[in-house]
């Protein structure tokens, strides 16, 4: 994979995180969730980081097709994320968030492996490739922060 394909993945992945993470609790509060429920939903998001990278990493190793696992994880996380707009009940949102983040949190570890494999002996370029993720996060937070300050979140 060329430098820009790897870099664009990191930019996009972390831009999406920048669109979700800083504003997620505000969105949940706007939906009427109380602080305990918001904390529980945030814990679910973080809890899937403990399990999903290992399970889907195992699957990628067994299949020897890590990009297929990454693509399917991205697709399924997108489908589950769309479910957040269908209902606002706590248990429904908890299941949707658990499903979304199960697949989403598994992507980055697999892509790190793909990146290092693709860079091969040029592994010293990793920092430059990965920096695009930080740029994507910052750009998303700044643009959406301004946008949400101008218009309503919902």
Regions of interest found by a model, annotated:
Residues 1-49:
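Helix-loop boundary and gating motifs at the non-cytosolic
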Residues 11, 80-109, 114:
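Hydrophobic core of transmembrane alpha-helices in multi-pass small-molecule transporters
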Residues 28-29, 59-60, 131, 147-151:
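Interfacial helix-cap and linker-helix signal at transmembrane-aqueous boundaries
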Residues 51-65, 148-149:
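Helix-to-loop junctions at the C-terminal end of transmembrane segments
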